[in-house]
Every structure is written in C-alpha cells, then in structure tokens.
UniProtKB/Swiss-Prot annotation:
GO terms for biological process: cytoplasmic translation. GO terms for molecular function: structural constituent of ribosome. This is Large ribosomal subunit protein eL31. CDD domains: Ribosomal_L31e (cd00463). One of its GO terms (cellular component) is cytosolic large ribosomal subunit. Belongs to the eukaryotic ribosomal protein eL31 family.
Amino acid sequence: MVKQEEKSIDTTVNLHKQCHKISFKKKAPRAIREIVAIAKKTMGTDDVRIDTELNKFIWSNGIRNIPRRVRVRLCKRKNEEEGAQSQFYTLVQHLQVDSYHGLLTEKTKAE
C-alpha cells in the first residue's frame, strides 16, 4: 500500500548500469525510460513527469553518449487537474552536483 502524502527524495541514478549493452541509437531514450521506471517504483505513482532541464542534461552529449550518473529529485505532488485518473504524480528534476562521491539517497521537504 502506497502512502497518500506528498514527499520528496534526492537520489543518484547510475545510467551506465541501466543502459549497459544497449545499442548506440537507443541509449538516451532508454535512459529516460529507466528514470521513469525508477521513479514509478520509488514513489508509487503511475504518472511520472520529466523536467525539461533533466531531459536536456541526458541528451546534452547526443543520443549515444549519455552521462554515467545523474542526481535527481523525485517530488510526489497532488494532482490538481480536473478529471485526473491518479491522485498524485511524480515530478523528476535534475540536481547539479560537482561530484557523486559519497552521496546517499535523502528525504527532503516537499516543495
């Protein structure tokens, strides 16, 4: 059972591990799909929205050369749209960091 409350989590996604042995022309689209799958599993929502800054970061080196890791913030928010199928959605945002060394998954205040 998924808790019905807003929350926010900062985590690091290892894209190199997720997209290993994927053909060159499918790496960036697969990276986006893997981030969506991780967000669905972690936050327990079916509606996942990728921020444009994260999309630009993934595609910054082209379709073949994706970054090895990316630090993201997963924000579970209440869906205010009328006629929405799900009560909550997850927004995935990019966090800029200098080094990934020693970073852990952290709960943060929901914005």
